[in-house]
Amino acid sequence: AIFKSYCEIIVTHFPFDEQNCSMKLGTWTYDGSKVAINAESEHPDLSNFMESGEWVIKEARGWKHWVFYACCPTTPYLDITYHF
């Protein structure tokens, strides 16, 4: 799959600014008892990443989250969020 990500750009300290972006992968329909979401690695595979001459990714990491909502406090909803 190919994913495109956009993040808010803050250029207060241009040209020395740094941005923090995230991409969350999960399901809104199925809970953790019906869907297994696992990351292959804490660091995403960037082999197909298209580099830009204007910026670089300094670091990229991912975490798995279990979220419990008030409607169903014993049912986990899972996602993997990558921060870069």
From Swiss-Prot:
Q: Which GO terms describe its cellular component?
A: postsynaptic membrane
Q: Which reaction does it catalyse?
A: K(+)(in) = K(+)(out); Na(+)(in) = Na(+)(out)
Q: How does it sit in the membrane?
A: Multi-pass membrane protein
* One GO molecular-function entry: transmembrane signaling receptor activity
Which positions are glycosylated?
Answer: N20
Q: Which UniProt keywords apply?
A: Cell membrane, Disulfide bond, Glycoprotein, Ion channel, Ion transport, Ligand-gated ion channel, Membrane, Postsynaptic cell membrane, Receptor, Synapse, Transmembrane, Transport
Q: Which Pfam families match?
A: Neur_chan_LBD
InterPro entries recorded: Neur_chan_lig-bd, Neur_chan_lig-bd_sf, Neur_channel, Neurotransmitter_ion_chnl_CS
Gene3D superfamilies registered for this protein in UniProt: Neurotransmitter-gated ion-channel ligand-binding domain (2.70.170.10)
Quote the PROSITE patterns the UniProt record gives. Answer: NEUROTR_ION_CHANNEL (PS00236)
Subcellular locations according to the entry: Postsynaptic cell membrane; Cell membrane
Q: Which residues cross the membrane?
A: none
Cysteine pairs bridged by disulfides in the record:
C7-C21, C71-C72
Q: What does this protein do?
A: Upon acetylcholine binding, the AChR responds by an extensive change in conformation that affects all subunits and leads to opening of an ion-conducting channel across the plasma membrane.
Protein family according to the UniProt entry: Belongs to the ligand-gated ion channel (TC 1.A.9) family. Acetylcholine receptor (TC 1.A.9.1) subfamily. Alpha-1/CHRNA1 sub-subfamily.
Assembly and interactions?
A: One of the alpha chains that assemble within the acetylcholine receptor, a pentamer of two alpha chains, a beta, a delta, and a gamma (in immature muscle) or epsilon (in mature muscle) chains. The muscle heteropentamer composed of alpha-1, beta-1, delta, epsilon subunits interacts with the alpha-conotoxin ImII.
The protein in question is named Acetylcholine receptor subunit alpha
